[in-house]
Amino acid sequence: MGKTYSSPINPIPKAPKGLAIHHWLNFLQAAYRLQPGPSEFDFHQLRKFLKLAIKTPVWLNPINYSVLAGLIPKNYPGRVHEIVAILIQETPAREAPPSAPLAEDPQKPPPYPEQAQEASQCLPILHPHGAPAAHRPWQMKDLQAIKQEVSSSAPGSPQFMQTIRLAVQQFDPTAKDLHDLLQYLCSSLVASLHHQQLETLIAQAETQGITGYNPLAGPLRIQANNPNQQGLRKEYQNLWLSAFSALPGNTKDPTWAAILQGPEEPFGSFVERLNVALDNGLPEGTPKDPILRSLAYSNANKECQKLLQARGQTNSPLGEMLRACQTWTPRDKNKILMVQPKKTPPPNQPCFRCGQVGHWSRDCKQPRPPPGPCPVCQDPTHWKRDCPQLKTDTRDSEDLLLDLPCEAPNVRERKNLLRGGGLASPRTILPLIPLSQQKQPTLHIQVSFSNTPPVSVQALLDTGADITVLPACLCPPDSNLQDTTVLGAGGPSTNKFKILPCPVHIHLPFRRQPVTLTACLIDINNQWTILGRDALQQCQSSLYLADQPSKVLPVLAPKLIGLEHLPPPPEVSQFPLNQSASRL
């Protein structure tokens, strides 16, 4: 029948399109019960048949495997007949609803028979033959896919259990992974009920004895996390799935789950309201004590929850919780008048900085004097940052190097640092070079090579040049020049420029540190000194196009422009330019 089922990366075959995941898991569980085990050919034929059967949905809603068996063609390849037969054998037969008894009075209709709810059945997990599941931690996309599948089903319902079983079979989760999955899928009430039921089942299993369980090695939850204890992990997973049997079977939380303790309500009266609501709302046979304990803590106000957390009684018996919160009383929340402290009066002595009375020295508006003379010019009246010798003389290059508009001195003095004694930040000078049509943008720079002194030269600022160009007279005599082709406005040129592959240092007037270039172009004819974009990019320069007002030309008479010999234009009445036109 083909080779046996191997162990691929994903041991679960993908469900056919249009079939719910929990229904597809039923077919997989039936296939894993075949002896000998199924092959890849059997799964391929099963998916192929289900794709055809979905187009005839007479066996769906509700699913009927007997009708599905009648749709299988005769002599169909694979073991589809055996898989469907196992499903028919393990699925309990649905009894027909009993007919309503006849009423004695013909005027009164007979009572409507209530349908009994089907008990959810959790079967043990069966893994593929020869393909044991490997543990994989949850990812957010996996949790979102599981939550989307069970969003329309209640916790503990058959669809919910089948989807969770498929997730457990695929990922082989540990005890911590199962706890995270429960917190992500269910509400706090359902998680609390499931936790209490799981603790009861674990205590019973530890008492009866489990194969491979050692009481001296810790609880079952700790031993199930051991990767070598695969049997204990499967037992814990089955107990975790069985704990859903005690949950309510409706999709939404009941009305008694929304009962909250008021901010000023005593804890005893809140528990009494919960007790009455559970007596009236719980169905018969549902244990009330675990639900009452869970709601007594989860729906209590913040003050009572803090008291229970501090004493470690979040899951204690109800009597201990009542004794812990019986002394709690709501706090007095009456409004009171807040009296602010009086402001410290100013000192009687004069300020040691300005000599005036009425303020502290930290609030003095006079700048803080320097501690000593300036280390540059030895002037004791200013700080080193304000020394005039450190400022660049911009009188000769006002058209080339412009300063940003700065604030007035009196405005800058008000912007002192907090508790800084009048310290003010120095002025920020940024290079702004205007590009105008009347005057070429030029800069006085200094160029130096390795082990050579800097040489002053006037360079043209060209934002269209990629590489800086230097004349051949500045090039060292022992330089190794390489031929190159330069594409300019006049076309390509091969004999005018050459490349100098050595470091070049360019000193700009507005930078203390020189700009270092790895290579530059050398003009053999000694005509051009161009500062290109490779140098401007290192100094973070920006283009500044100066705004120039447009020229206003006077209106000239015909005599001034030589048109006095032409006849005057004819006067033709036009609409709406004639005088008789309507102005409405």
UniProtKB/Swiss-Prot annotation:
Q: Which GO terms describe its molecular function?
A: aspartic-type endopeptidase activity; nucleic acid binding; structural molecule activity; zinc ion binding
Keyword Hydrolase present in the record's keywords: the answer is: yes
A GO CC annotation given for this chain: viral nucleocapsid
Lipid conjugation (N-myristoyl glycine) is at 2
Zinc fingers, CCHC-type class: 349-366, 372-389
Q: What does the UniProt PTM comment say about this protein?
A: Specific enzymatic cleavages by the viral protease yield mature proteins. The polyprotein is cleaved during and after budding, this process is termed maturation. The protease is autoproteolytically processed at its N- and C-termini.
Q: Which residues are connected by disulfide bridges in this protein? A: none
Q: Where is this motif: PTAP/PSAP motif?
A: 98-101
What Gene3D superfamilies does the record tag this protein with? 1.10.1200.30, Acid Proteases, Human Immunodeficiency Virus Type 1 Capsid Protein, Zinc finger, CCHC-type
Q: Kindly state a single biological-process term from the GO annotations of this entry.
A: proteolysis
Assembly information from the UniProt record: Interacts with human TSG101. This interaction is essential for budding and release of viral particles.
PANTHER family given in the database record: ENDOGENOUS RETROVIRUS GROUP K MEMBER 24 GAG POLYPROTEIN-RELATED (PTHR40389), IGE-BINDING PROTEIN (PTHR40389:SF3)
In Swiss-Prot or TrEMBL terms, this protein is called Gag-Pro polyprotein
**Organism in which the protein naturally occurs:** Human T-cell leukemia virus 3 (strain 2026ND) (HTLV-3)
Q: What lineage is on file?
A: Viruses, Riboviria, Pararnavirae, Artverviricota, Revtraviricetes
